[in-house]
């Protein structure tokens, strides 16, 4: 939703701007979510040189700490909400996407949620709600890390320490 768009779900997100554009540490960096009825997963996916892995994880941990401490400004939040609104309107043009959305709505809510109602829900999200979400759900000590390819032992140990809060 809105938190994902702001944190890492687009090219103007915090993750992309900080890790790729400002620090130049990764080619690809983004976040995404898997929502389920009573649970879910929040993922951060990064394509990085193995020698930079610990530095990138450290930057992600710092960004998570920042969003837990500081609220997004209303101006910035409006950009992300409007981005999602436009995306939802565009998706509603596809019959396949509408069927998939309606099926999920039936499973989660017992009825299809009209596009207008969904957009109103997106536009009503506040900065304090996003911060509360981050505080409640983004717990680094519960994070897991997966690497594809060869990761140096030194980098792996540093990543373990970062995820243990050290």
Spell out what each predicted region is.
Residues 1, 130, 145:
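Short, conserved catalytic/metal-binding micro-motifs enriched in Asp/Glu and His
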Residues 1-14, 121:
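His/Glu-based metal-binding/catalytic segments typifying zinc-dependent metallopeptidases
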Residues 11, 52, 155:
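Short phosphate-engaging motifs
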């Amino acid at each position: 939703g809105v938190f994902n768009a702001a944190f890492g779900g687009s090219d103007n997100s915090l993750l992309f701007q900080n890790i790729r554009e400002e620090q130049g540490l990764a080619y690809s960096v983004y976040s995404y979510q898997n929502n389920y009825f009573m649970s879910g997963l929040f993922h951060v996916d990064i394509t990085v040189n193995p020698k930079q892995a610990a530095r990138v994880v450290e930057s992600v941990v710092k960004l998570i700490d920042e969003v837990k401490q500081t609220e997004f400004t209303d101006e910035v939040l409006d950009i992300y909400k409007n981005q999602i609104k436009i995306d939802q309107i565009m998706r509603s043009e596809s019959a396949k996407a509408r069927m998939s959305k309606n099926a999920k709505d039936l499973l989660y809510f017992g009825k299809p949620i009209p596009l207008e109602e969904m957009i109103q829900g997106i536009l009503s999200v506040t900065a304090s709600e996003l911060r509360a979400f981050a505080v409640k759900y983004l717990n680094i000590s519960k994070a897991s890390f997966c690497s594809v390819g060869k990761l140096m032992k030194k980098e792996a140990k540093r990543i373990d320490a970062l995820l243990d809060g050290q």
